[in-house]
Structure formats: C-alpha cells, structure tokens
C-alpha cells in the first residue's frame, strides 16, 4: 500500500508510464510482494475510482493541485487500505477515503512487457454485491478517458511496485468533505487489469463494500504494521477510537460491511467542513468537463481498436493476504533543524559542509561558553529557544519571530510532533554550556536499523541513527508490549516484520493490528541483539540561565538606541493611495515592511547617515566594518613586523659585541697557554729552531736581499708575549663601555624609527595633495625619503671610548633641497615624541646638508643625519656637459659635495663590512691606530679611510693569520718602507671607478712626519718598548721559572722600568714625541 506524504501536486504523463513500470519490475523501489499479493493489488487498483489524480491524454498534459486542510497540514501518520484479499479493518471515514484514493492513483500503471498479452479465459462472474445504502456518496471523477461497464481481465505476470513518495492523491482524498463520520464506504471485489497496448480505459462506477475475508496462512513475506492515530497541534484529538478487526472463519465470501462505531474525530472536522465548499465547486466543474473528456477518450479508443475482456474471479481459490508497504521514513537533524527525505539524503547531509560547519560552530560555542561564561555578546540578549539564536533587541526578536526561517522551523517541529517552546523572549544572562556524551557516528547500516526497530517496538523510547530525536505523546506509549514480550514462548518461529525507522507518535494511545507478530519480533530482538539495541544518543544540556522578560528589561534593551530621522522616511503610494513601500532619503533605500521602518530608524547605517548629513553631534557606537578591521589588522601586523625587525637588529648588534668580547677572551686564554710553552722552549739549550730563530719578514713575506730559509715542518705560531699583551690591554682600555654602547644603540634606533614615520607622513601628504589636485602626474612616484643607513665608525664597528658622534645617511628619491630639509626638521620632533618620551635637541645645518640630533640625558650622544640622493652621483658620472643636468635642480638644492661625501661614506661602510670585518686582528689594529691618531698630533693628519685601507692590505697580504702584536708591527713596517711618501704607488680607493689616491689630501711634510714616526715606533717595538708607542704604563712581568738550563750571563730586565736609558738621550727625545 501507499503511505501518505505531504506532497501537494504532481503530474502523470502516460508516455512515461512504461519507464516507471520497468523500474517497478526491476524491484527498483525495494518492496517485496508475493504473486498473489500482486494480483490482489492489481484487482484493487483496477476497480477503485481515482478521485485524486487526473490522468492526461498523450497529447495533452493535465495537472492539478491538491490543497490540504489546515488542521491536517502536518499529519504524517500513515493510513492504509487493505486489498480485497486481506483482512478488512474498520477505519475512520477520512482514512478510508485516503486509502481509496491512494489505491486509485496507481490503477493506471501499464505493465513492463509490450510484446506479450497474458489473457485468461472468461469465468462466471460472482453475484453482484447488494446495493449501497442511501447515504453512499458517488464520486464524479474527471478522467480523460471513456468509461465502460465491461471491465477487462488481463493479468500481468510481473509484480507491481509502488514508490512511497508519490502519495499526494491520498492526502487530497483525506481532505474531501464527508457527509457523516459513521458513513459506510464499500470496496468492490472484482479484479481487473489492463492489457499492454491498451489506451482505452473503461471503468464503471460501482458501489463499494468492505468484505470480511477469511485470512490466509501468514507468509514470511507478509508485513504487519501499526496504525497510529494522527495528532495535530492546532486542535488535539479528544479521544481515539479503538480499531477492532473483524474476522470470519468461513469458506465463502461474506458481504457483511464492517463500519466504525464510537465517538467522532473532532480533529478532522475542521478539515472536513473547510473543504466542503471547494469540493462542491470542483464537482460542478468535473460534471461540465465530463462530456468533452468522454468524447476525447472515445476518439482515442476508436483509434486503438482494442477492447477489454472481463474475467470472473476465482470462486474456490483462497487468496493470500497482501503486504502493505512500509511506513514513511523520516530523518531529522537536530543540529541543522531540518528533515531529510531518505537515508541517502540524510547521510549526504551529515557528510556535507553545511552540517559540519554548524556542528563545529556548536561545539566551539559550547567549549567557549563552558570555559568562559562572560563571552562577548551574551549579555542583554533575547534568545529564541526553538531556533537557538540570540537577538540584540526586542525589534530584532520580533522580526525573527515573524521571519520565514522561524516559521519554517515551527512548521517542521509541528509536523514531526516535537515540542515547541514558547515564543516569549528570554533575556540570556549566561552562555550555554554543554555536557558532551560519547556517541557513535550515525550510520544507516541494516544492523543498526534493526536494533533501532527493536527499541521502538519494545522499550517505548524512540532511538534511531539520528541525533536528538524525541517523541511526544502519552506515557503509556507501548506499556502493554513489554508485558507481552515475556509471555510469548521463546521457541515460536519469529516472523520477519518490517517496521519503520522512526514512528512519531502524536495521539493518546498506540494502536496496532499486528501485536502478535510485533511481540514475536520484539522477543527475537531482545534474545538475539540485546546490546545493539542500545544506541547512544548525544545529549546537549542547556545550562543557559534565562530570566523572565519584564517590561522594565525590555524597555532597558530598547532605550539604548532611539530612532532618529522620522521625517526622512517617506511613504510611497500607488494610484489608489495605498502605501506600497517606504523610502529613506538619507540612506537611499526602500523597504515594504511596516515593521522594518522602526528598526531601520534605529539601525546603525541610518544613524551614521543621519550623523553625517544632519546632526554631527549624534553619538553612534563604534563598530568597525570588515574593511576597517582588515586595515587595522594590517597595520597591527606591520607594526609587529617593525618591532620584530628592530628586535632582531638589536640582537644582532648585541651578538656582534659579544663575539668581539669572546674573541678577546679566547685570545687571552690562548696567549697564556702559549706563553708557558714558549718560555720553556726558550730555556732549552737546543730548543727552538734548528737553523736559528727566523728573522723578521719583509712586506711580501721574504726579507730583502736574503735567500729564503729552508722550509721544514710548519712550526707552531710563535706569540710575542709582550707585544700581544700590551696591544690587547690597550684595546681593552679604549673599547667603549657598556653604557656608551647602549646609549648609542638607543639613540640610533629611535632616530631610524622616527625617520621612517617622517617618511610615511610625507608620503601621505603627497598622496592627499595629488588627489586634491590633478593626479595625472606625480601619481607613480616613489616616496620622498627612501631609507636611512649607518655609516662611519658606527657601521664599521670602530667606536672608541668617549666617542659621542655617529653618522647616518638619509637617502632621498630626488635631489635634497633646503625645503625638504626644513620639513624633515619640523616633523622629526613630533615623531620622536611618539616613539620616546625623552627630549631631544634638533638643529638644521644647511651648510652641512644635515640635521643634527642631540640627546639631553647622559651620556649625551649626537647623531648627524646627512641628506643625499643617488641621482647626484649618476649625473656626476655622465659624460658631456654637466651644467645641462644642473638646470633642472631646484634653486635651494643642498651642497653637492656634502651629498657626494655621504654617498662615498655608504660605499666605504659596505666595503669595510665585506673585507675588513672578517679579517683577524684587523679591527683591533685599526682601533689602536685611531687612538694613536687622537693622541699624537703627528698622526692626526692621517686620513682614516687611507689608514683602514692600509691596515687591511698589510694584514691580508700576510702568509698566515697575524696576532695583534705581529699585525701592528707589520703595519708600522709598511709605513716605514715609504709607502705613503710622494712618488710612491700610493693607496687607490677601491670604491671609486676612476683611479683616486686616498692620500691626495696630505702634504709632503705630513707624509714625511708620519713615515718618520712609524720608523721610530718600529725601533721601540724592536727593543720591547711597545708600551711607549701605545701610551700606557709597562705591565708587570710574569714570574720567571728558573731551571738548570738558564745560563744567561746578563741580568734579565725584570724591574719594570725602561731599559732604554743606556741608549743615550737621543732615544729619550724621540720618545717624547709620543
């Protein structure tokens, strides 16, 4: 049989019926019927007039819409009409009509075979049934074929299968008006079928009687089912009549009609009387269209030329009872609050992205609410318990209650019989918390379905493969079933019954026609699968504390925002003067909902427009948009990147300083270890070198005029104890203190960050200027300030103790001018105040093309920021007339030479970091010579860049790494050889493309004085007077280790005083020069 589903309209086209029959013969729809059941079904389908379906002609497609009654709008309980060969059960009038209409709806299915017609011989027709009572209602059906009084008897050997979804006709029949509740409806007994190629349909309107037939022996394929009363939330049923089956044990057919007795169904009266007027009009229209339909069907029959033959039913054959179809399978998802048509759809829904997102959001909200009860947005909100949403105000809550989404959920819950919470708003004062219960993943396997079925029939708890499913009804849902389970013998053969996955019980009492079979099935389930019947269901416990809404609380929620701008919302009327929509002139928007007018006036968009165009003093809450939020996040990300960059830079500087100290510590440790070794070697009689100690090497590694000594095994590096100790001790005294290094690092980093902000400010100003004016040019130019770089001793790491001046170079995209310099000097104090609370003194030195920044706290540091641009050097390197390029220069351009010097300082710093920083002892010797240039006036004229080049060349040209003492000696040897004198090769600048001597600024006298001083310092080094060169006191001598090999005749010079007095007063005078 066909279950009732809330489908409202469908259309059948005869040209497609063959394909449906093919699917039916292939067992496409999954129903199992025996052959006798199929024949009984065919007999029933052929004789009952279809009052709910209009079959169309092959050339014309006709359809209609069945309107359901408001009372039974959500009824999903199936009602079945048994076939002529099954047990006749008394039923209410609307249910019987539904069954008759359902059976008639499938009476016109052709068979799948088109070549063979299975005909049977004529048999004597049985005695006609008695005439119907006077109250029998005759239906005038609007069929599109000609009726005939001679039913055909042609049977198909194939079985008929029905699809449980196409049941709109049954719902339509249930809504037909009925003159009386206790009226008797009859069902005809003769069987009829249709031949394969027939297109002419004949069917006589016969009276119907319900005949009680002796039930046949139950077959294993027989399906017993339960008929549940229908419930409605609009008007509940007062009392449900008990369905009492009537059985007669006789060998012949009985025509005794079985009728209903008892109270009337008040739940159906609204549907019956509301559809009376529409049904009467339909009957009048059907009578008018009958003549035209009959003529069209007659023409079709004449064209086909086929007739139907009637075959009398078998008098002596006992028919097997026919299986009714399965009840409807309803799949409901409590997370998404939707229902699915079948298990495949429900499975796909569970695997879909929408369900997973909602489930993840639900879990996240539960975890968040359980961990933090004061989450954002949970205070002062109106909550809808049915939809599980929160509204920020009373207007939004009212709009949600009227909305389509809420109504859809209400309709679905009403149809499923689920409890519907009250629509009264509740103020949420705490977030929801959940108690997660472990649950198995929903599946649709047959084993789980069987287990679920057992649970439904035996335990009065509707558990299934779906989550959160509950049933409504009386507490005595299936109370008698449990007692019957234990009373049934265990050795009885269990019958295979088909039960729905989920039966929603909406009435007061559960009634069934197959209690015995169901009890046996329940016993089998309890015996075989007692464990699988228990399905874990996840429970979500709502810990939300909802307070009853009082008028005061609603007023408090609504008083936060007052509507503004009533005068700017005008009513738009049509020609009849009816208001069709509202138009807001401020927001330039229209809406047709009168309830939305007040909400629009309170909305943030309208208030922002009102503030912008009418009242700037209106207070509007700050709620950044997605774009503004993204911009803010981008700014924060950039700020974090800046902070990370400066932090890494400071760490690199700190690491560099630590590595320098580590190198010094390693040197001292290695020197002390080797000191003991060489002291012992020096006291050995034959120790040392086999050919005597090697003499000092020349500049190129070989003494001039002497053959190279034979090379033996590579000796260990011989440290000069006194020279290295003195050099490193001097270096430790001239190295900056920790306070000075931190002060330099602080002021330099603050200055660099402030200049970056100044660059951003100037760039924004230029953009605004271009937007206000004509932005056809200047649109694609770079920012005015491109970057700031460290130069000089700061970049090279040559700071000495007491140095307070460092240099920075600010690169510009254009040639720097006095105007740009003044603008930077004006903006720099503002940006410095943003970065650091300390005070700084800023001076603008136009002659130096620089800005001088002085700190006001100890130790006072000075930063010189020189402006330059690479364009100046590019123009200077061009061939031809330079004045042609200078015509474009601004009138207040800064000093060209100062800018070129700043560019040269950039190249020098880059070269030094690449060549000299990694050279052993190079940085230490340059610091020693810088201190020498500051102490001795003769050396003050030596250019620092030339000295750096000379030291790097002298140390890098050595055959092996040099210790600090050897490196200093080697540098003095180079200068003493006359490399800086006039006529010598000189020192070419590696950072210039054209040959350029770095000593060009020195006079001849200065060159000779420095060369002479270097020669005298070399003599002092030879006589162990390096402390005089370095300007420091002699270090205490290390303790002597006396041994038997010490056969020195002269006394060791260990008194710590100068041993150079015996040389005469000449050496004393030369020492005074240092």
Curated annotation (Swiss-Prot):
GO molecular function, a single term: double-stranded RNA binding
Any one GO CC term of the record: nucleus
InterPro entries named among the record's database cross-references: DZF_dom, DZF_dom_C, DZF_dom_N, Matrin/U1-like-C_Znf_C2H2, NT_sf, Znf_C2H2_sf, Znf_C2H2_type
Tissues showing expression: Expressed in lung, liver, lymphocytes, heart, pancreas, placenta, brain and kidney.
Modified residues (Phosphoserine): 1054
Function: Involved in postimplantation and gastrulation stages of development. Involved in the nucleocytoplasmic shuttling of STAU2. Binds to DNA and RNA.
This protein's name: Zinc finger RNA-binding protein
């Amino acid at each position: 049989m066909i279950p009732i589903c809330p489908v409202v309209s469908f259309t059948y086209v005869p040209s497609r019926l063959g394909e449906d029959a093919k699917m039916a013969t292939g067992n496409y729809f999954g129903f199992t019927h025996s052959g006798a059941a199929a024949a009984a079904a065919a007999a029933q389908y052929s004789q009952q007039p279809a009052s709910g379906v209009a079959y169309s002609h092959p050339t014309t497609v006709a359809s209609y819409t069945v309107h359901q009654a408001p009372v039974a709008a959500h009824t999903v309980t199936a009602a079945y009409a048994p076939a002529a060969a099954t047990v006749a059960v008394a039923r209410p009038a609307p249910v019987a009509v539904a069954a008759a209409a359902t059976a008639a709806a499938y009476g016109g299915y052709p068979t799948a075979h088109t070549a063979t017609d299975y005909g049977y011989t004529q048999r004597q027709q049985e005695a006609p049934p008695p005439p119907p009572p006077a109250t029998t209602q005759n239906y005038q059906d609007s069929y599109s074929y000609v009726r005939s009084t001679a039913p055909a008897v042609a049977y198909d050997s194939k079985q008929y299968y029905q699809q449980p979804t196409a049941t709109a006709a049954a719902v339509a029949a249930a809504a037909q008006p009925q003159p009386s509740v206790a009226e008797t409806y009859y069902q005809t007994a003769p069987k009829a079928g249709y031949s394969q190629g027939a297109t002419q349909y004949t069917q006589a309107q016969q009276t119907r009687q319900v005949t009680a037939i002796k039930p046949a022996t139950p077959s294993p394929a027989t399906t017993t089912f339960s008929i549940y009363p229908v419930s409605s939330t609009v008007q509940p049923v007062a009392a449900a009549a008990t369905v009492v089956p009537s059985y007669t044990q006789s060998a012949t057919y009985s025509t005794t009609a079985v009728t209903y007795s008892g109270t009337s169904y008040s739940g159906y009266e609204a549907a019956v009387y509301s559809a009376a007027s529409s049904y009467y009009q339909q009957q009048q229209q059907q009578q008018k269209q009958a003549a035209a339909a009959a003529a069209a069907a007659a023409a079709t029959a004449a064209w086909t030329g086929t007739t139907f033959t009637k075959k009398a039913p078998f008098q002596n054959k006992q028919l097997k009872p026919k299986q009714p179809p399965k009840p409807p399978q309803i799949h409901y998802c409590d997370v998404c609050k939707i229902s699915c048509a079948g298990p495949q759809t429900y499975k796909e829904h569970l695997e879909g992205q929408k369900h997973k997102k909602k489930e993840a959001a639900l879990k996240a909200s539960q975890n968040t609410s359980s961990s933090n009860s004061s989450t954002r947005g949970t205070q002062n909100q109106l909550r809808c318990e049915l939809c599980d949403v929160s509204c920020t105000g009373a207007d939004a809550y009212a709009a949600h209650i009227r909305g389509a989404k809420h109504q859809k959920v209400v309709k679905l819950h009403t149809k499923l019989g689920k409890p519907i919470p009250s629509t009264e708003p509740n103020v949420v004062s705490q977030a929801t918390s959940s108690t997660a219960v472990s649950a198995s993943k929903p599946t649709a396997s047959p084993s789980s379905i069987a287990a679920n079925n057992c649970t439904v029939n035996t335990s009065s708890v509707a558990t299934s493969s779906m989550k959160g499913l509950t049933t409504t009804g009386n507490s005595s849902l299936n109370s008698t079933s449990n007692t019957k389970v234990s009373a049934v013998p265990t050795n009885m053969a269990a019958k295979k019954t088909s039960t729905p996955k989920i039966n929603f019980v909406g009435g007061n009492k559960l009634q069934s026609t197959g209690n015995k079979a169901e009890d046996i099935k329940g016993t089998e389930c309890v015996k075989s699968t007692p464990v699988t019947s228990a399905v874990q269901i996840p429970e979500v416990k709502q810990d939300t504390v909802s307070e009853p809404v009082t008028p005061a609380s609603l007023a408090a929620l609504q008083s936060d925002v007052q509507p503004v701008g009533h005068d700017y919302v005008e009513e738009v009327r049509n020609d009849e003067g009816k208001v069709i929509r509202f138009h807001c002139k401020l927001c330039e928007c229209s809406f047709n909902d009168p309830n939305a007018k007040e909400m629009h006036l309170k909305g943030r968009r309208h208030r922002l427009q009102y503030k912008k165009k009418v009242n700037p003093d209106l207070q509007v809450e700050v709620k950044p948009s997605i774009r503004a939020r993204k911009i803010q996040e981008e700014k924060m990300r950039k700020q974090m990147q800046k902070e990370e960059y400066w932090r890494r830079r400071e760490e690199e500087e700190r690491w560099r300083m630590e590595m320098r100290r580590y190198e010094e510590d390693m040197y001292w440790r290695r020197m002390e270890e080797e000191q003991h070794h060489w002291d012992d070697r020096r006291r050995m009689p034959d120790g040392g070198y086999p050919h005597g100690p090697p003499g000092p090497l020349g500049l190129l590694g070989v003494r001039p005029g002497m053959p190279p000594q034979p090379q033996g095994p590579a000796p260990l590096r011989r440290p000069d104890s006194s020279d290295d100790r003195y050099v490193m001790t001097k270096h430790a005294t001239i190295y900056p203190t920790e306070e000075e290094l931190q002060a330099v690092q602080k002021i330099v980093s603050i200055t660099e960050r402030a200049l970056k902000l100044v660059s951003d400010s100037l760039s924004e100003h230029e953009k605004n200027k271009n937007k206000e004016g004509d932005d056809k040019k200047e649109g694609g130019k770079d920012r005015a300030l491109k970057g700031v770089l460290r130069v000089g001793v700061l970049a090279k790491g040559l700071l000495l103790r007491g140095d307070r001046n460092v240099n920075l170079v600010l690169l510009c995209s254009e040639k720097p001018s006095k105007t740009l310099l003044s603008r930077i000097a004006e903006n720099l104090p503002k940006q410095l105040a943003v970065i650091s609370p300390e005070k700084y003194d800023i001076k603008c030195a136009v002659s130096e093309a620089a800005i001088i920044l002085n700190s006001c706290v100890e130790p006072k540091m000075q930063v010189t920021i020189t402006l330059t641009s690479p364009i100046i050097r590019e123009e200077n390197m061009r061939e031809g007339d330079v004045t042609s390029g200078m015509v474009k220069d601004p009138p207040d351009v800064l000093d060209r030479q100062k800018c070129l010097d700043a560019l040269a300082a950039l190249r020098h710093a880059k070269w030094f970091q690449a060549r000299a920083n990694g050279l052993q002892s190079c940085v230490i010797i340059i610091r020693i010579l810088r201190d020498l240039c500051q102490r001795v006036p003769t050396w003050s004229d030596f250019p620092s860049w030339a000295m750096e080049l000379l030291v790097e060349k002298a140390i890098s040209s050595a055959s092996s790494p040099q210790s600090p003492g050897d490196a200093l000696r080697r540098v003095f040897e180079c200068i003493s050889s006359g490399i800086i004198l006039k006529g010598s090769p000189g020192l070419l600048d590696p950072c210039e493309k054209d040959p350029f001597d770095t000593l060009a600024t020195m006079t001849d006298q200065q060159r000779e004085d420095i060369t002479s001083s270097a020669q005298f310092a070399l003599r002092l080094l030879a006589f162990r007077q390096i402390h005089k060169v370095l300007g420091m006191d002699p270090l205490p001598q290390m303790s002597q280790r006396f041994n038997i090999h010490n056969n020195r005749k002269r006394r060791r010079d260990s008194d710590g005083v100068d041993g150079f007095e015996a040389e005469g007063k000449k050496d004393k005078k030369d020492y005074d020069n240092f």
